[in-house]
């Protein structure tokens, strides 16, 4: 019978409200005995109670606590010295419950609290006066005070630290749990199975709630999760902090690149993945449309606010309808409009470049202001307002569009089977009335639509102004190639014409939407938006990425035009200055006599108005100094801000930190993402490369199959060909510099020889023509003195100007060499790594890759590589020529300096001869000029004087003959 009871008791939980009375009495006696013994030790020992408690816990652990056995879960259980006590229970709610004797913080029990709620720790309650609720399943005799309750709170806290048993416990309020007061006074009963089930259920529901919350609050800031009070949301927020978040210097308040993530496909799901995910584009289009319409309404109300008073005064007496609130349509919201252009229609008279597109510059209706009556003028103004509201003229574009995007049409949709290309400032503007994004980007849908055929419209007509019921979704196929898609099946995806979406200067939010819709990898998104500088080809699962660098052709044209205008203005200024000088010289020569007569009067008048001018200048300078300080500070701040904005824009465009110096090319990064049925291109500045490729595709669509790989090849080819004109200009400049340097010294020698020959010829002709008119020349010399002096002055000034211009040309030559070398090095920097990129690109085609199918484009890529290698070798050759020209220029400068030194030596030699002749004369004259008695002083004849003069002449002749023989002059 005892064995049956023991077997039956093994299935009973460890805690039960009903147990046998002998066992309870035995436990009470043991507990009372241990308590009395422990209290006696505390009274007899002089040490602190905490130290005694610590010692007793170490040596007499079994005597102090009633928990002697530890199960496999690491929990303590009550037992006797021999075996575990099994308590019988009839309560089914406590079956399988374990006892956890770890101390826990008290929790409020006012209402049900889930496990997922945040548990806030509260201060430890005083154990001297416990205020626990009376458990439902315990008898009043079981409510014994703990032995530890006699300790103070600080002593109890130190004891708990030594025990290292401060843990948090969670209690499921929905299940019946009981508390008991034992020696620990904080023991909690936990149903582990129910707890684990509850945690698993909350975890699954928390994941679902978080996924719904992400879908609902997509693109919001991370700071919105700070006020959440559940542990599941907090844990999910902590997990989100460890996700990949690439750094972005252009982060906005609405979105950031850390929201861009690669959604992993569920391997167990049988639903096929749709590419592209047009639902993301549809949601973004709705949000963008609502935002732009609200902005347009605000702008229209602000624009027409100034006409409110006139409308209120004149609406009662005049006919017509004038709406108080503006009617907002797609025409009034230019961001939602688009323009359709056919690139081949602009090819007139051999023109290979399209005209500039300006569809938004609508012609404003001129107002007639010649009427005298104010009533007629008001009626005209109101009729003009009605036309503007109803028809859409004089659209006031939002300032954020004009300031942020000078090139308004940032999104361009192209397909070779369409008659025209769609240009739009926004993603939503690409859609025609009644059209969806599936009709643009899903090959199976637009191929079926094209096979059914559409109504053609004029390619240059703006589509937003046409009604939706009269406009088809997209234009049909051209009549030249009707059999292109006649036999096409949707299964044969290779025959579907690919779409091409060209994006210029995308925002961070647009980049995020496109990445999610087309399944672009986060690394690709980071490279595009942060401006990857290195040129490369990367292969992904669904696409491959090509990073290719070009140069800003538009900026280069502006620089050339500005430089040409500057040169023309400089030449005009030089001519005008020379003309003014000649006129001023003639005026001064003619008015020289009049100026001498008017000197006295001008001096008198100058003495009167000069002090007044000085006083006015002093006053203006005092006022100017007070204003210049503030204006200079504002100007400096504005210039620094403008410089920072330019650097930021250039960094986004080319990836470089600083703007290139004058003479260097501005790099432009072009990113090409090639899918099987589509192409995405990104660039951050306007460039003509996409226009050229679209025109080329339309011209050659009857002779080749335009695929996505061909579009990528055509873009690379057009970017490479854009460097050819620059290299030709560099070649011409290099050869001109070399020829000018080699002819620099020859021109100087020829000019000197020509001038000497002309002088000698003029002298000989004078002697031959007038051999007997020397006396007449001498007599007429005094009369022609003024003319000779003026002529000599003009010739000396002309020679001085010629020398100055020559030296200036030499200085300009050095500047030309430096600028040309700078240009060569900038192009070499852009072309240096392109050969390796093309080589890797061709390798992708030659190998068996799933993402890059076999085609004939690999043959053309080899031709591009040959072009690049040829251009690089030509640039290296030009660099060597410029280096040699630079050395030749320095040699010419040394020759010129040597020539100058030789001329100076000649002048010094002539001065030496003159000194040799004059020095003896100075000695003789100095001796006879002393204030002493000299020979011949008292003679009345001129004998001594004549003799001294003759001696001096003979001495000068002898000195001249000696120096001429000695130095070879």
Curated annotation (Swiss-Prot):
Keywords: Membrane, Phosphoprotein, Transmembrane, Transmembrane helix. Belongs to the CorA metal ion transporter (MIT) (TC 1.A.35) family. One of its GO terms (cellular component) is vacuole-mitochondrion membrane contact site. Residues 1-49, 96-153, 167-186, 199-256, 559-662, 746-769 are annotated as: Disordered. Residues 1-11, 37-48, 565-578 have a biased composition (Basic and acidic residues). Gene3D superfamilies: CorA soluble domain-like, Magnesium transport protein CorA, transmembrane region. GO terms for biological process: intracellular magnesium ion homeostasis. Pfam families: CorA. The chain crosses the membrane at residues 913-933, 942-962. Residues 749-769 have a biased composition (Acidic residues). One of its GO terms (molecular function) is magnesium ion transmembrane transporter activity. The modification Phosphoserine is found at residues 114, 175, 182, 383, 576, 582. This is Manganese resistance protein MNR2. The modification Phosphothreonine is found at residues 177, 571. Residues 141-152 have a biased composition (Polar residues). Residues 24-36 have a biased composition (Basic residues). The keyword Electron transport does not apply. Residues 1-912, 963-969 are cytoplasmic. Residues 934-941 are extracellular.
């Amino acid at each position: 019978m005892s064995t049956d009871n023991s077997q039956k008791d093994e299935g009973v939980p460890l805690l039960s409200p009903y147990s046998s009375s002998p066992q309870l009495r035995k436990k009470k006696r043991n507990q009372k005995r241990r308590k009395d013994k422990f209290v006696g030790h505390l009274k007899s020992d002089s040490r602190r109670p905490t130290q005694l408690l610590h010692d007793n816990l170490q040596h007499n652990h079994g005597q102090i606590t009633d928990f002697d056995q530890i199960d496999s879960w690491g929990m303590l259980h009550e037992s006797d010295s021999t075996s575990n006590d099994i308590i019988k229970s009839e309560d089914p709610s406590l079956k399988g419950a374990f006892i956890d004797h770890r101390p826990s913080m008290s929790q409020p029990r006012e209402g049900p609290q889930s496990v997922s709620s945040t548990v806030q720790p509260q201060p430890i309650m005083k154990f001297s006066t416990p205020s626990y609720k009376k458990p439902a399943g315990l008898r009043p005799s079981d409510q014994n005070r703990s032995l530890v309750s006699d300790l103070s709170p600080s002593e109890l806290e130190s004891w708990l630290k030594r025990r290292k048993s401060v843990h948090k416990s969670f209690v499921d309020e929905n299940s019946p749990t009981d508390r008991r007061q034992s020696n620990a006074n904080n023991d909690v009963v936990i149903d582990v199975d129910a707890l684990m089930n509850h945690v698993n259920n909350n975890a699954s529901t928390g994941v679902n709630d978080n996924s719904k919350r992400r879908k609902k609050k997509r693109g919001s800031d991370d700071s919105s999760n700070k006020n959440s009070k559940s542990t599941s949301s907090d844990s999910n927020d902590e997990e989100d902090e460890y996700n990949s978040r690439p750094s972005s210097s252009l982060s906005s308040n609405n979105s950031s690149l850390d929201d861009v993530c690669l959604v992993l496909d569920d391997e167990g799901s049988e639903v096929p993945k749709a590419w592209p995910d047009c639902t993301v584009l549809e949601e973004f289009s709705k949000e963008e449309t609502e935002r732009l319409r609200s902005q347009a309404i605000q702008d229209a109300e602000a624009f027409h606010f100034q006409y409110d008073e006139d409308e209120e005064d004149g609406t009662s007496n005049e006919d017509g309808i004038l709406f108080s609130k503006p009617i907002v349509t797609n025409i009034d919201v230019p961001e939602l409009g688009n323009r359709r252009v056919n690139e081949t229609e602009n090819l007139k008279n051999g023109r290979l470049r399209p005209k500039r597109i300006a569809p938004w510059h609508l012609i404003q209706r001129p107002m007639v202001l010649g009427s005298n009556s104010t009533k007629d003028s008001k009626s005209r103004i109101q009729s003009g307002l009605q036309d503007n509201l109803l028809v859409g003229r004089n659209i006031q574009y939002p300032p954020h569009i004009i300031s942020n995007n000078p090139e308004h049409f940032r999104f361009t949709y192209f397909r070779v089977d369409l008659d025209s290309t769609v240009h739009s400032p926004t993603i939503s503007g690409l859609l025609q009335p009644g059209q969806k994004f599936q009709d643009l980007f899903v090959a199976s849908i637009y191929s079926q639509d094209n096979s059914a055929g559409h109504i053609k419209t004029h390619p240059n007509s703006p589509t937003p102004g046409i009604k939706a019921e009269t406009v088809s979704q997209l234009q049909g196929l051209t009549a030249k190639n009707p059999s292109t898609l006649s036999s096409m099946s949707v299964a044969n995806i290779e025959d579907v014409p690919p779409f091409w979406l060209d994006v210029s200067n995308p925002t961070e939010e647009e980049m995020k939407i496109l990445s999610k819709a087309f399944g672009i990898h986060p690394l690709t998104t980071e490279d595009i938006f942060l401006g990857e500088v290195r040129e490369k080809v990367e292969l992904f699962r669904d696409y491959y990425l090509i990073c290719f660098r070009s140069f800003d052709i538009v900026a280069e044209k502006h620089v050339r035009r500005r430089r040409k205008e500057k040169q023309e203005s400089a030449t005009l200024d030089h001519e005008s200055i020379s003309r003014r000088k000649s006129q001023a010289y003639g005026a001064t020569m003619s008015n020289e006599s009049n100026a001498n007569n008017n000197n006295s009067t001008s001096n008198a008048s100058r003495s009167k108005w000069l002090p007044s001018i000085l006083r006015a200048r002093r006053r203006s300078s005092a006022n100017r100094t007070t204003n210049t300080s503030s204006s200079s500070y504002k100007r400096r701040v504005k210039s620094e801000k403008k410089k920072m904005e330019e650097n930021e824009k250039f960094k986004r465009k080319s990836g470089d930190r600083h703007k290139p110096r004058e003479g260097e090319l501005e790099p432009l990064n072009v990113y090409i993402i090639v899918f099987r049925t589509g192409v995405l291109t990104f660039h951050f500045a306007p460039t003509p490369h996409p226009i050229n490729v679209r025109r080329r595709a339309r011209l050659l669509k009857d002779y080749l199959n335009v695929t996505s790989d061909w579009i990528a090849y055509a873009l690379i080819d057009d970017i490479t060909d854009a460097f050819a004109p620059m290299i030709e200009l560099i070649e011409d400049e290099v050869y001109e510099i070399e020829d000018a340097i080699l002819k620099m010294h020859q021109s100087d020698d020829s000019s000197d020889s020509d001038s000497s020959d002309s002088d000698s010829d003029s002298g000989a002709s004078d002697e031959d023509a007038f051999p007997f008119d020397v006396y007449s020349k001498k007599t007429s010399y005094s009369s022609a003195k003024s003319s000779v002096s003026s002529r000599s002055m003009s010739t000396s000034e002309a020679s001085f100007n010629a020398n100055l211009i020559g030296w200036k040309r030499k200085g300009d030559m050095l500047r030309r060499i430096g600028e040309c070398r700078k240009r060569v090095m900038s192009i070499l920097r852009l072309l240096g790594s392109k050969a390796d990129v093309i080589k890797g690109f061709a390798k992708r085609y030659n190998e068996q890759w799933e993402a890059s199918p076999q085609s004939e484009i690999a043959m053309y890529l080899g031709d591009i590589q040959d072009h690049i290698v040829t251009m690089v070798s030509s640039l290296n050759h030009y660099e060597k020529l410029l280096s040699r020209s630079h050395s030749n220029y320095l040699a010419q400068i040394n020759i010129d300096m040597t020539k100058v030194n030789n001329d100076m030596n000649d002048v010094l030699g002539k001065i030496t001869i003159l000194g040799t002749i004059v020095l003896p004369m100075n000695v003789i004259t100095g001796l006879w000029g002393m204030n002493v008695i000299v020979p011949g002083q008292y003679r009345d004849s001129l004998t001594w004087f004549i003799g001294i003069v003759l001696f001096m002449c003979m001495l000068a002749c002898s000195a001249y003959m000696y120096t001429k023989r000695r130095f070879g002059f």
